[in-house]
């Protein structure tokens, strides 16, 4: 019997594991539609930021009815805010479920730089899961929705502004804390959340605006709370006042309350208060005088913008314009505004300065390099036309690279990463070169590993006729002209325009057939007509590739090299022209011989003396 029970339990456990694995498999299919796990975490991080902006909207729900002197609620705002918050919390609950399944059932952790999931130990999982799971549960509990949806329709009692404020605050802190692990995971994989300096500066500016908006929302609710405190204090000073908490609700307010409340709390500026019985509203007097507490629900944008402006103004001014009463809560709120404004302003300025300095630092380095170059050229007494060419090259190189030393950066990488990076940079460009289209990927990879990026300014000479050819250039962008006077005769001249996809410096034939270590002599002069960017391979590297990869010696590749070689094209054109001229000369000489033969035959066949005399006379004439 015990064996059967054990067997039954074992089978049941297997079934549970199978169901869990099935659920995990379905979740993997859903998340498989995302490019990588990091993209999903970025999306969740964005949802958390949106949630931080939604929660303070609960503080705008209470209103004051200026006609009946009672409290009411913006029911439209209640519905909208509850729906949005529930949707975002549901989205985050999906993330929690996926996280728990992948981390507890099949222990996994943050993704690697390529999006691959890395397995962690159980001890690491316990330390990471406990705190974050508790924070996640607290942050997604629908406490504000329950409060505003259950108490408002019943109207059994007034929803205390203080309770609502502390509910939002108690969940706002966990919502901020839960963003930290997501932020660390995203920055660990991407290096930074912001992919550009402008986005980073905008993100810091958004956080500054968010804090201003949150302070404005708390100021709004505290103003209503202060108004309620004034009414209750006035009632406490009057012997015949019978106001209760429920009497302040609009559904229970009566005419007696209206007459009493109309004169109980006059709005007096703190500086003009002379009577000790007058209630001091402190820094909330602006909200009461402006009417934002008494506006209709359809005027919510006006209320929102005014409170946001109040928060932004006082955060930026560090609370210097705030005139508080002797209320401890009000003074503490003013202190928070002052300190947080100082910290946020310092963080904002520091981050913006960091993003700006990352670009201006290189500009300063470039300017310093220009000054050093000018000093060197003056010291060496470089001619003015050479100075202009040097300046033009430095400016062009800066525009293309922004001060990044590409070759030094590639050399600092590990070998496998360097080869993979070069393959990504050069392989597609190499395949666009007609000369290299017949090569397989292994040959192209060998060439990619030895290519270097080069830049040329206008009128720069790449190679001159009669000089040794040390590099072979593949053109990425720009126009060049290739000329030669080497044609086997005096006065010969040939020119060819080179564009993107062409190459110059015919080293392939030399690398394939020549046994000499001396570089070949260029038969052409190549000059840049515009700014040119390309990549080169040295003669030694090309010789090494030709030696190691014997497939370059195939007849098909050799014919293709000759077909695209400018030197072979020039020779072929010269041979064709010479053959055509020989053909024309032979044809002309043949025609002349035929005419001479006809004339000779005509003279021999004419036996008449008169004709001979007449012919001689005609010739004499």
From Swiss-Prot:
Binding-site residues for a nucleoside 3',5'-cyclic phosphate, renumbered to this chain: 435-556
A Pfam family: Ion_trans
Transmembrane intervals: 44-64, 77-97, 129-149, 163-183, 199-219, 330-350
Extracellular face of the membrane: 65-76, 150-162, 220-329
Keyword Transport: yes
Keyword field: Calmodulin-binding, cAMP, cAMP-binding, Cell membrane, cGMP, cGMP-binding, Ion channel, Ion transport, Ligand-gated ion channel, Membrane, Nucleotide-binding, Transmembrane, Transmembrane helix, Transport
Protein name: Cyclic nucleotide-gated ion channel 11
Residue ranges of domain IQ in the record: 569-598
Phylogenetic placement of the source organism: Eukaryota, Viridiplantae, Streptophyta, Embryophyta, Tracheophyta
Protein family according to the UniProt entry: Belongs to the cyclic nucleotide-gated cation channel (TC 1.A.1.5) family.
Parts of the chain on the Cytoplasmic side: 1-43, 98-128, 184-198, 351-621
Organism expressing this protein natively: Arabidopsis thaliana
Protein's job: Putative cyclic nucleotide-gated ion channel.
Gene3D superfamilies tied to this protein: 1.10.287.70, Helix hairpin bin, Jelly Rolls
Record's bilayer topology term: Multi-pass membrane protein
One annotated GO molecular function: monoatomic ion channel activity
Subcellular location: Cell membrane
GO cellular component annotations of the record: plasma membrane
